[in-house]
Amino acid sequence: MLRRSLSVVFGRRTIACKSCGIELQNKIKDGPGYFVTPQKAIRPAAKQLELAKQLLYGERLRIEKQLTGPDRNTLEKWKELVPPSCKRCMDALHHNRYDTAEFPEHTLEDVGKGVPRDAVVYHIAPLWQFPMGLDRRVLQSSKKVCVLFSKIDMVVQRPSHMPQDVGAFFQSLLYHDLHVKITNFRFFSALKQWNIQTVRNALSKESYLLGGPNAGKSSLINALMRTVVYESRRLVSSKQSSATPADLPPKAHLDIHSAGVSTIPNFTRQPQQYDIKGKIIHDVPGYRTSKSHTFDFNSMIQKDYLLRLRKSDSKTYLTKKYTSINGTESGRCYTVGGLFYYVPPAQTINQVTRYMPGDPQKFQSIDKGLEVVRDVYSDRWDKETGSHPLAEYIHVNPALGDKNSFVRHVIPPFQGTIEIVMRDVGYLRVVATGSFKFLGLHEIWVPKGIEVSVREPLTDVFRTTIEAYRDSGSVANVAQMIIKRPYISSTYPMAHNETDPLAKMREMYLERTASNLSARRLMNRDPLELISQKQKERVNLYWHYCW
């Protein structure tokens, strides 16, 4: 059917790859959009055998089909209806073979060309990565913007922990920091089908999904389709849907119309349109939301671990196990796979919970950890001597055995618990235990090109927000929370040999707030005196997020 008519279709109009949306062609093998026409195996005796089976066991086969579902021949016919995918997508999806050069990054300017000025934009960002993933250019645009936070199952254990009241926090924060008035927030998990109906109700008649790579746009499309299977379809053009028989079961219908989903960033290459119960949704390719996101995950991280990192689910993220680490004068550190090194101040006791795959390790110092990485790849390990004892715990490639490949991020002072977020990697929850005493600043050393931010624990913030909002029934109470202190902050990258990080941090803080003096706080207080005393409430000195 569809396969047989492909040559005719190519003769009069183009068709797009089902997975990435690029225009298909079968002329240039190494060109974009190349696909191979499937060749169906011909079995001369198959037709005669099928006829004999129908004559001998026709009624029995009909009853069995009703009880067990479609037979193999029917399944093959359904597969023929699935639109074709290009070779790049087929290799990536089914064989995990891909060349990163075929997955180039897009910019907001690139993808924005296809978004009308009066469009309603739904800005999608993974909740676990907050505040990174939100793009101030989209939030401050002249378009009507709604925010959809995805992958909430990586932060909370059940959807009831994310009521709509939580939106008051984000509404107040964005108004305070960016002076934008956004009131429409939704929180969902496509994997768990959480709050998908709520998202569908919030969509306008025509919507454009904008967000970074792997934000969850295509996954949301598929989750929406599952709520109204037979009233959802992929559109060949803005007014024409791909035709399907009326007797298809739900799974076959979804196979034909679903969006292409992959853990590989920049998988979608061209905008694709879908009709979800009369609402037109434009799935726009992911674009680079980071200002300086240059880290090459594919060359720096072992491929098997990178796959685990990108496929992380709630079981990985919502672990309850923590690792205790005592800070030392030598700089004892905590790492997962050699991808980063968290260094607590000397004489402090801390509990670290990882929200990423891999087993944590502790080393006497960063230099010792880097030495282990280099030793894992040294020539002294071969088939006879075996591998390094810690080889299974190292997930980075040799280039990350060099200290110069890392940036020293100093974390602003905090009291109690914080979360350290690494873009596209995961996050750590750090709990400072024992009696309060300021003994120095915490640090995390991360490869160049990976952005880092810190925040108060999201679940704690949500709990406080819900209480404040329900006490008054107004956003005003929540707005007062935001005015009182910042809840998110950028880190402070410093030289490896900086000996007075607190003084340097103050200097950098003044530079960052020079164009927004109203953001400055506690400048008339002695910083050391302020952070050396336990406060009734957090003060979050020098906390400031650079949007």
UniProtKB/Swiss-Prot annotation:
The keyword Mitochondrion applies. Keywords: Mitochondrion, Transit peptide. One of its GO terms (molecular function) is GTP binding. GO terms for cellular component: mitochondrial inner membrane; mitochondrion. Gene3D superfamilies: P-loop containing nucleotide triphosphate hydrolases. May be involved in the mitochondrial lipid metabolism. This is Genetic interactor of prohibitins 3, mitochondrial.
